[in-house]
């Protein structure tokens, strides 16, 4: 056994429906401002303010049916339904007609955001 200064995080995985297998979550890539109607709701213009990309920790992935605690110091804990695409294997410079062959499967995700904190940071020019 290795002698870690800090214990490494447990491997995050999700159950693959109708099997006994699990899908390991290595990285979480996200796209923000990718739905025009929602961008407008958030005060952005879809033709001017382009989508952006960010990552999230695999530890943010929790199993379906898990309890989510309402965080302290927020008055606006906002939910959004997300389309989750599980990548089966990677690559680079993938031709559009081959892209679907890299997808393992799809799922629904629930993105929870402290919207009041997000807006406050955005107004001060900070990343959220």
Description of each model-found segment:
Residues 1-128:
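Catalytic-core "active-site belt" of small-molecule-metabolizing enzymes
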């Amino acid at each position: 056994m290795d002698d870690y200064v800090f214990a490494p995080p447990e491997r995050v995985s999700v159950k693959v429906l109708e099997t006994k297998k699990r899908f390991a979550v290595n990285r979480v890539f996200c796209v923000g401002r990718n739905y025009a109607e929602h961008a407008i709701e958030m005060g952005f213009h879809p033709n001017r303010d382009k989508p952006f990309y960010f990552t999230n920790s695999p530890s943010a992935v929790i199993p379906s049916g898990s309890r989510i605690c309402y965080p302290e110091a927020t008055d606006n804990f906002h939910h959004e339904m997300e389309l989750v695409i599980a990548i089966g294997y990677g690559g680079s410079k993938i031709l559009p007609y081959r892209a679907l062959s890299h997808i393992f499967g799809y799922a629904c995700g629930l993105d929870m955001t402290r919207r009041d904190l997000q807006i406050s940071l955005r107004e001060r020019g900070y990343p959220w």
